[in-house]
């Protein structure tokens, strides 16, 4: 089974961790519970919930990459992975609800969409993220995938000034060629926002840019 090829054990800061694909409904629900704890309770996101689980229509069509603490059995990190087969079954990519993906249509057959990435607050020492990325690379190799897409979160709590400044900061070096560029369905009106604030790049987005 695919999870056996991805599974990898590691000891980080005396924590015995393993990355694998969820193989039971209980493991998937543990990941959904972690997502709810972080996105809803910690970050204040307004998301639908069933019994304290973050669940939407995409979940049943995704693979769920998880990191577990082998000493207590808890899921302490997760990623949701959607490939072209799952996207067809659910009616499209999650990202397509936010962006026009037509310019990258030609690469979607070999693409994995990443979503719902999170790490338990007691395990944010970098080790869990490293294991998730190790598992992700292995998954892409086994599935013969070459591209990653997904939505990265940037706070809009200040009305969008931080987001606008971050965009201006990153576009100088990281803006993709036009033929690979996607466009938001509801764009931020940059000309109405401050674009010169000193801002930090969110850790997850910084990691993607280094990949």
Regions found by a protein language model. Give the residues of each.
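Acyl-donor binding region in acyl/amide transferases
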Residues: 84-211
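Short amphipathic alpha-helix that is part of the acyltransferase structural core
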Residues: 4-85
């Amino acid at each position: 089974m695919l999870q056996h090829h991805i599974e990898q054990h590691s000891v980080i800061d005396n924590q015995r961790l393993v990355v694998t694909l969820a193989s039971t409904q209980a493991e998937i629900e543990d990941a959904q519970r972690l997502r709810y704890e972080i996105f809803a309770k910690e970050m204040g996101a307004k998301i639908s919930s069933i019994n304290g689980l973050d669940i939407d229509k995409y979940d049943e069509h995704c693979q769920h990459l998880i990191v577990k603490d082998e000493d207590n059995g808890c899921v302490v990190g997760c990623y949701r992975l959607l490939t072209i087969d799952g996207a067809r079954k659910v009616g499209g990519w999650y990202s397509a609800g936010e962006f026009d993906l037509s310019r990258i249509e030609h690469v979607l057959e070999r693409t994995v969409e990443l979503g719902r990435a999170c790490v338990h607050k007691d395990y944010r020492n970098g080790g869990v993220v490293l294991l998730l990325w190790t598992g992700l690379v292995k998954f892409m190799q086994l599935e013969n995938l070459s591209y990653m897409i997904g939505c990265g979160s940037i706070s809009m709590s200040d009305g969008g000034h931080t987001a606008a400044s971050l965009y201006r900061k990153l576009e100088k070096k990281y803006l993709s060629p036009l033929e690979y560029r996607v466009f938001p369905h509801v764009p931020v009106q940059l000309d109405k926002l401050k674009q010169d604030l000193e801002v930090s790049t969110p850790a997850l987005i910084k990691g993607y840019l280094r990949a």
